[in-house]
Amino acid sequence: MGGLFHKLRHPRRCYVVCTIPRSGSNLLTDGLRATHRAGMPKQFFLPKFETRYGVELALDPLADYPGYVRGIANTKTTGNEVFGFKLMSWYLDTFLTRLRDTCAFGDAATDDLSLLRNAFPRLRFVHIHRRHKLRQALSTARALQTGLWKVKNGEMEEREPQFDAELIEQSLREAERQEGIWQNFFQRIGVRPFEVEYEKLCHDYEETIRSVLDFLRISLPRGARVGPPVTIRQSDEISRTWEERFLAERPSAYSPATG
């Protein structure tokens, strides 16, 4: 009965971090998770990760996708009944289709926002992006070569990345395309997400994390502080050298005024 009273007093609240690669989403979600009050936001619905989470929780996303969705939301919450997850734009449409095809959260006539909120009660949207799109593209090109997408203290790249202007420009255009997917989605569903700028997150980590918590209406215990970042920035002398060289070799490919 105590569990029932707890759920009545603290109804489930959900949020999704909407992002694209190299936007700083790991820095953000690691910080939210470390508060122990904002769920455990991960890419639970990226198909290649679902098998792992399914095994962990004895869920079968292939046989019972509604059961998997509900099981994740029921188990990956913090004690205050907050559930968070992360979505990349490149599998957004696939995820929506899978939710709709189950007929458990809506049908062909159900709009996307209702579909999502049927699956995730009181869902709110957080969008993290980078203002400096060229540096984002540099980071993507580097990660594609090294395979290191998330860096923690003490970790090193296993192989030296090489400057590749074509790969950098392709990464820049792809980032623009993927950000466009999110902007079209927010416009379509009529939602204005809470915007987090990666550069501001790096400059004032604790204040930015707290601003997201305020948006989500999550309070921390009195006197609690947001800990230092778990994930570290990958920008270094290589990144600075690449940026200067790219701008020199392809001056028309990027305008700082727009990125």
Predicted regions and their residues:
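PAPS-dependent sulfotransferase catalytic core
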Residues: M1-M88, V230-D236, W242
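Membrane-proximal basic amphipathic "stem/tether" segments
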Residues: M1-V16, R100-D101, D107-A108, R240-G259
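Aromatic-acidic/polar surface patches that form glycan- and anion
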Residues: H10, I20-P21, T77, S171-A175, ...
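Flexible, glycine-rich phosphate/dinucleotide-binding loops
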Residues: G24, P47, Y91, L134, ...
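Short, structurally constrained coil/turn elements
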Residues: A34, T78, A119, Q187-I189
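The conserved 3'-phosphoadenosine-5'-phosphosulfate
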Residues: F45-R52, K152-E160, E166-I168, F185-A257
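PAPS-dependent sulfotransferase catalytic domain
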Residues: G84-Q187, E206-P221
